[in-house]
Amino acid sequence: KPQVDLDKLRDFKGGVVKKLTTGLAGMAKARKVEVVTGIGAFVDPFHMEVQGDNGKKVVKFKQAIIAAGSQAVKLPFMPEDPRVVDSTGALELRQLPKRMLVIGGGIIGLEMATVYSTLGAEIDVVEMMDGLMMGADRDLVKVWEKFNAKRFGNVMLKTKTVGAQAKEDGIYVKFEGEKAPAEAQRYDLVLVAVGRSPNGKKIGADKAGVAVTERGFIDVDKQMRTNVPHIFAIGDIVGQPMLAHKAVHEGHVAAEAAHGEKAYFDALQIPSVAYTDPEVAWAGKTEDQCKAEGIKYGKAVFPWAASGRAIANGRDEGFTKLIFDEETHRVIGGGIVGLNAGDLISEVCLAVEMGADAEDIGKTIHPHPTLGESVGMAAELYEGVCTDLPPQRKK
């Protein structure tokens, strides 16, 4: 039986992180950006005090962009114990547990569950809601659930975690709800992945005159400008979705606006990706959103069972779905479940932003055999001209 070398795995992960952070430091130096490391807080609207390893330093500024991010939400009844971790702690890979509990059936929880189950851990998942990966259309999640039906142990939906106790042999967790076991369950490791809270109340924003909501978010306009005109904010601290690529885009907008350019955040879509196995990705309007907003829509679903590349990969469980405006046939959203779905969703993102219709996508020549051509085939399917499936009625 293959053995997992955690030391080598940690070293590889550390090497990747070091390479990326070193690259950022190099780019900052090339642009003559001074990096001050430490914990910072505003002193007034034009000064920030930073407490670093070598003492305090006051930074004076004419304009500022707040990118203070968020932190993992903690459950008050969870014991302070190294066997209870958040996603950051889980990525440190201190140990390979025999039995692990993931609290939270969202993207982060399921990604970590995928990692640890791949390494050999027995995984239980508990989720308060009636489904996993909420936010994604249920047909996408259903494929993931079927593929992982035997991968995890007990998946407890509509169930709360109500108590926990640290003992020498593990963390004992008590549940309440529809799928809750009667007795407390013992785990070697517990991951708490129940969301993140913004750091708006930790930076002395009030001293700069920046308004912060009760929950710690900072409200901004379309230029990412706060109520103080020369101070901007981006990322998790300005609201959902808390995604790195959204934050980067907001950063571009804020920097350009601070430079005096007419830059605005007006994205028509923000893609979401669950880096699970299989991956689940979606962008633009979901079917659930269309129904809730009363949007008349049509859809086309191309099954990967008809994809030569998916069949050759031995991974044809997925599908590619495009969602169209019923009247104009423009692409307004889409979802993909399957191998490398996160890489494939980019074409859907561009289609939504550019106002492409089914004919635009369907008549774009895609390389064969690839998973990417499933996007083109879904568009052809909607137009009734796909030759890789039985005849369809032309729209």
Residue ranges, per PLM feature:
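A Rossmann-like FAD-binding core segment of flavoenzymes
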Residues: E34-T37, A41-G52, V59, G120-K222, ...
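Glycine-rich dinucleotide-binding loop and its adjacent helix/turn
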Residues: I66-E122, V126, R151, V155, ...
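Short glycine/proline- and acidic residue-enriched helix-loop micro-motifs
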Residues: K1-G14, I361
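FAD-site-proximal beta/loop scaffold in flavoenzymes
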Residues: D81-P97, Q185-A258
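Rossmann-like dinucleotide-binding cores of NAD(P)H-dependent redox enzymes
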Residues: D11, G15-T21, A25, L91-E92, ...
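Flexible, glycine-rich terminal cap/loop adjacent to redox cofactors
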Residues: H259, Y275-T286, K291-K395
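A short alpha-helix-loop-beta-strand transition element characteristic
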Residues: K1, Q71-V73, A211-E214, E261-P271, ...
